[in-house]
Protein backbone atom coordinates (compact mmCIF):
# COMPACT_ATOMS: atom_id res chain seq x y z
CA UNK A 1 0.00 0.00 0.00
CA UNK A 2 1.35 3.40 -0.97
CA UNK A 3 2.06 5.77 1.93
CA UNK A 4 -0.40 8.58 2.50
CA UNK A 5 0.59 11.94 1.03
CA UNK A 6 2.12 14.43 3.41
CA UNK A 7 -0.49 17.04 4.26
CA UNK A 8 0.93 20.54 4.46
CA UNK A 9 -1.27 23.40 5.61
CA UNK A 10 -0.34 26.99 4.78
CA UNK A 11 -2.04 29.93 6.49
CA UNK A 12 -1.63 32.83 4.08
CA UNK A 13 -4.69 35.02 4.60
CA UNK A 14 -3.58 38.68 4.70
CA UNK A 15 0.12 37.81 4.96
CA UNK A 16 3.25 38.95 3.16
CA UNK A 17 3.85 36.64 0.20
CA UNK A 18 7.53 36.43 1.21
CA UNK A 19 6.49 34.82 4.51
CA UNK A 20 5.32 31.67 2.76
CA UNK A 21 7.95 31.38 0.00
CA UNK A 22 9.44 28.49 1.97
CA UNK A 23 6.45 26.47 0.80
CA UNK A 24 8.27 26.12 -2.52
CA UNK A 25 11.23 24.50 -0.75
CA UNK A 26 8.84 21.89 0.64
CA UNK A 27 7.03 21.45 -2.67
CA UNK A 28 10.12 21.01 -4.84
CA UNK A 29 11.12 17.71 -3.16
CA UNK A 30 7.63 16.29 -3.83
CA UNK A 31 6.93 13.29 -6.04
CA UNK A 32 4.94 15.45 -8.45
CA UNK A 33 7.84 17.85 -8.96
CA UNK A 34 10.35 14.99 -9.23
CA UNK A 35 8.33 13.47 -12.05
CA UNK A 36 8.08 16.81 -13.83
CA UNK A 37 11.81 17.54 -13.63
CA UNK A 38 12.91 14.01 -14.58
CA UNK A 39 10.84 14.39 -17.75
CA UNK A 40 13.03 17.41 -18.53
CA UNK A 41 16.17 15.30 -18.29
CA UNK A 42 17.19 16.11 -14.71
CA UNK A 43 18.15 13.26 -12.34
CA UNK A 44 15.21 11.07 -11.32
CA UNK A 45 14.71 11.51 -7.57
CA UNK A 46 11.21 10.02 -7.52
CA UNK A 47 12.29 7.16 -5.23
CA UNK A 48 13.14 9.74 -2.55
CA UNK A 49 10.17 12.02 -3.11
CA UNK A 50 6.99 11.81 -1.02
CA UNK A 51 3.57 12.65 -2.37
CA UNK A 52 2.32 15.93 -0.92
CA UNK A 53 -1.03 17.64 -0.61
CA UNK A 54 -1.14 21.36 0.14
CA UNK A 55 -4.04 22.86 2.07
CA UNK A 56 -4.75 26.59 2.12
CA UNK A 57 -7.40 27.52 4.71
CA UNK A 58 -9.03 30.92 5.09
CA UNK A 59 -12.08 32.52 6.67
CA UNK A 60 -14.22 31.79 3.60
CA UNK A 61 -13.69 30.15 0.21
CA UNK A 62 -13.71 33.55 -1.49
CA UNK A 63 -10.49 34.82 -3.00
CA UNK A 64 -8.05 36.20 -0.47
CA UNK A 65 -5.29 38.71 -0.98
CA UNK A 66 -1.65 38.47 -0.04
CA UNK A 67 0.91 41.17 -0.73
CA UNK A 68 1.43 42.66 -3.24
CA UNK A 69 -2.24 42.37 -4.21
CA UNK A 70 -1.99 38.70 -5.24
CA UNK A 71 -5.29 36.83 -5.37
CA UNK A 72 -5.41 33.27 -4.03
CA UNK A 73 -8.24 30.74 -3.87
CA UNK A 74 -8.39 28.91 -0.52
CA UNK A 75 -8.91 25.15 -0.53
CA UNK A 76 -10.78 25.05 2.82
CA UNK A 77 -12.30 27.30 5.43
CA UNK A 78 -10.81 27.36 8.92
CA UNK A 79 -13.87 25.47 10.10
CA UNK A 80 -13.59 22.51 7.71
CA UNK A 81 -9.81 22.27 7.14
CA UNK A 82 -8.14 19.12 8.51
CA UNK A 83 -6.34 19.54 11.82
CA UNK A 84 -4.01 16.52 11.75
CA UNK A 85 -1.40 17.91 9.39
CA UNK A 86 2.16 16.79 8.84
CA UNK A 87 3.28 20.41 8.62
CA UNK A 88 1.42 23.65 9.32
CA UNK A 89 3.14 26.83 8.09
CA UNK A 90 1.75 30.12 9.43
CA UNK A 91 2.66 33.40 7.74
CA UNK A 92 2.51 36.75 9.45
CA UNK A 93 -0.51 39.04 9.00
CA UNK A 94 -0.98 42.46 10.53
CA UNK A 95 -1.51 42.33 14.29
CA UNK A 96 -5.10 43.49 13.82
CA UNK A 97 -5.94 40.42 11.69
CA UNK A 98 -7.27 37.91 14.21
CA UNK A 99 -10.33 35.99 12.87
CA UNK A 100 -11.86 33.88 15.64
CA UNK A 101 -12.13 30.90 13.30
CA UNK A 102 -8.39 31.12 12.61
CA UNK A 103 -7.59 31.07 16.32
CA UNK A 104 -9.77 27.98 16.78
CA UNK A 105 -8.13 26.28 13.82
CA UNK A 106 -4.60 27.02 15.06
CA UNK A 107 -5.38 25.79 18.56
CA UNK A 108 -6.84 22.51 17.31
CA UNK A 109 -4.25 22.01 14.55
CA UNK A 110 -1.38 22.71 16.94
CA UNK A 111 -2.55 19.86 19.15
CA UNK A 112 -2.85 17.37 16.30
CA UNK A 113 -0.18 18.35 13.76
CA UNK A 114 3.33 16.89 13.71
CA UNK A 115 5.22 20.11 12.93
CA UNK A 116 4.06 23.72 13.26
CA UNK A 117 6.11 26.53 11.69
CA UNK A 118 5.66 30.27 11.82
CA UNK A 119 7.44 33.00 9.89
CA UNK A 120 7.75 36.67 10.76
CA UNK A 121 4.91 37.84 13.04
CA UNK A 122 3.04 34.58 12.40
CA UNK A 123 4.36 33.49 15.79
CA UNK A 124 2.32 36.25 17.43
CA UNK A 125 -0.71 35.06 15.46
CA UNK A 126 -0.19 31.56 16.84
CA UNK A 127 0.44 32.92 20.34
CA UNK A 128 -2.95 34.64 20.19
CA UNK A 129 -4.49 31.16 20.04
CA UNK A 130 -3.08 30.46 23.50
CA UNK A 131 -0.85 27.49 22.64
CA UNK A 132 2.65 28.89 23.20
CA UNK A 133 2.80 29.39 26.97
CA UNK A 134 6.30 28.56 28.21
CA UNK A 135 7.60 27.88 24.69
CA UNK A 136 10.82 29.29 23.26
CA UNK A 137 10.11 31.24 20.07
CA UNK A 138 11.05 34.19 17.93
CA UNK A 139 9.37 36.61 15.56
CA UNK A 140 10.36 39.39 13.18
CA UNK A 141 13.38 40.89 14.90
CA UNK A 142 12.07 44.43 14.66
CA UNK A 143 8.88 43.30 16.42
CA UNK A 144 10.40 41.42 19.36
CA UNK A 145 9.61 44.24 21.83
CA UNK A 146 5.98 44.11 20.67
CA UNK A 147 5.88 40.32 21.03
CA UNK A 148 7.27 40.49 24.56
CA UNK A 149 4.65 43.07 25.50
CA UNK A 150 1.67 41.30 23.94
CA UNK A 151 2.62 37.73 24.85
CA UNK A 152 4.83 37.66 27.97
CA UNK A 153 3.89 34.01 28.50
CA UNK A 154 6.27 33.10 25.64
CA UNK A 155 10.06 33.03 26.01
CA UNK A 156 11.03 35.25 23.07
CA UNK A 157 14.59 34.81 21.78
CA UNK A 158 16.61 37.10 19.51
CA UNK A 159 17.49 34.45 16.89
CA UNK A 160 16.85 34.01 13.17
CA UNK A 161 14.88 30.90 14.02
CA UNK A 162 14.11 28.84 17.11
CA UNK A 163 13.15 25.18 17.45
CA UNK A 164 11.26 24.02 20.55
CA UNK A 165 9.94 20.50 20.08
CA UNK A 166 7.56 20.45 17.14
CA UNK A 167 7.37 24.26 17.05
CA UNK A 168 9.64 26.03 14.58
CA UNK A 169 9.48 29.84 14.59
CA UNK A 170 11.48 32.30 12.53
CA UNK A 171 12.25 35.98 12.30
CA UNK A 172 11.57 37.89 9.09
CA UNK A 173 10.78 36.26 5.77
CA UNK A 174 14.42 35.59 4.83
CA UNK A 175 14.99 33.80 8.12
CA UNK A 176 11.81 31.82 7.47
CA UNK A 177 13.13 30.60 4.13
CA UNK A 178 16.33 29.43 5.83
CA UNK A 179 14.34 27.76 8.61
CA UNK A 180 12.17 25.81 6.18
CA UNK A 181 15.26 24.84 4.19
CA UNK A 182 16.95 23.55 7.34
CA UNK A 183 13.86 21.54 8.27
CA UNK A 184 13.70 20.04 4.77
CA UNK A 185 17.37 19.03 4.90
CA UNK A 186 16.82 17.31 8.24
CA UNK A 187 13.59 15.60 7.21
CA UNK A 188 13.95 14.50 3.59
CA UNK A 189 16.84 13.08 1.56
CA UNK A 190 19.42 15.89 1.92
CA UNK A 191 20.98 15.45 -1.53
CA UNK A 192 17.53 15.56 -3.10
CA UNK A 193 16.63 18.67 -1.08
CA UNK A 194 19.87 20.44 -1.97
CA UNK A 195 19.46 19.74 -5.68
CA UNK A 196 15.72 20.19 -6.11
CA UNK A 197 14.59 22.31 -3.18
CA UNK A 198 17.51 24.69 -2.67
CA UNK A 199 20.01 24.92 -5.53
CA UNK A 200 17.30 25.21 -8.18
CA UNK A 201 15.93 28.18 -6.24
CA UNK A 202 19.39 29.56 -5.36
CA UNK A 203 18.74 29.25 -1.61
CA UNK A 204 21.36 28.29 0.97
CA UNK A 205 20.11 28.10 4.57
CA UNK A 206 23.67 27.59 5.85
CA UNK A 207 24.96 30.92 4.54
CA UNK A 208 23.67 33.08 7.41
CA UNK A 209 22.86 30.42 9.96
CA UNK A 210 20.46 30.33 12.89
CA UNK A 211 21.93 33.19 14.90
CA UNK A 212 22.22 36.91 14.21
CA UNK A 213 25.75 38.24 13.94
CA UNK A 214 24.90 41.83 14.87
CA UNK A 215 23.23 43.30 17.97
CA UNK A 216 19.60 44.41 17.77
CA UNK A 217 18.84 48.10 17.24
CA UNK A 218 15.39 48.84 18.61
CA UNK A 219 14.34 52.51 18.89
CA UNK A 220 13.82 53.55 22.50
CA UNK A 221 10.27 54.66 21.68
CA UNK A 222 9.46 51.11 20.59
CA UNK A 223 10.81 49.71 23.86
CA UNK A 224 8.81 52.18 25.95
CA UNK A 225 5.45 51.99 24.18
CA UNK A 226 2.61 50.07 25.81
CA UNK A 227 1.83 47.73 22.93
CA UNK A 228 -0.63 45.64 24.90
CA UNK A 229 -2.70 48.77 25.61
CA UNK A 230 -2.47 49.87 21.97
CA UNK A 231 -3.82 46.62 20.56
CA UNK A 232 -6.46 46.46 23.26
CA UNK A 233 -7.85 49.71 21.87
CA UNK A 234 -5.79 52.28 23.77
CA UNK A 235 -3.26 54.74 22.38
Where are these regions (language model features)?
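The feature captures the short pre-catalytic strand/loop hairpin that immediately precedes
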Residues: 154-164
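Extended, subdomain-level signal for the structured scaffold at the beginning of enzyme domains
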Residues: 1-116, 124-127, 145, 157-158, ...
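Short, structured coil segments at secondary-structure junctions
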Residues: 50, 112, 131-133, 151-152
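Short, glycine-/small-residue-rich phosphate/pyrophosphate-handling segment
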Residues: 131-149
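Short glycine/threonine-rich catalytic loop with a Thr-x-Gly-x-Asp
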Residues: 169-174
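Structural detector of well-ordered beta-strand residues that form the stable sheet scaffold
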Residues: 116-117, 138, 157, 168
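Short pre-catalytic strand/loop immediately N-terminal to key active-site residues, enriched for Gly-Thr
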Residues: 110-111, 163-168
Amino acid sequence: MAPKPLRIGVMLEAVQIADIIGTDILGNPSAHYARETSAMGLPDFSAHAPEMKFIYPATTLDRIFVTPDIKVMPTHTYDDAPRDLDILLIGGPMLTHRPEAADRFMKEAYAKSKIVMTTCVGSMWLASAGVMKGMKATTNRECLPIAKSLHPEVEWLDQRWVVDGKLWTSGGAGAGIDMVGTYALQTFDPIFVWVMGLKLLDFDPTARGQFYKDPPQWPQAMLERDWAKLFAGGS
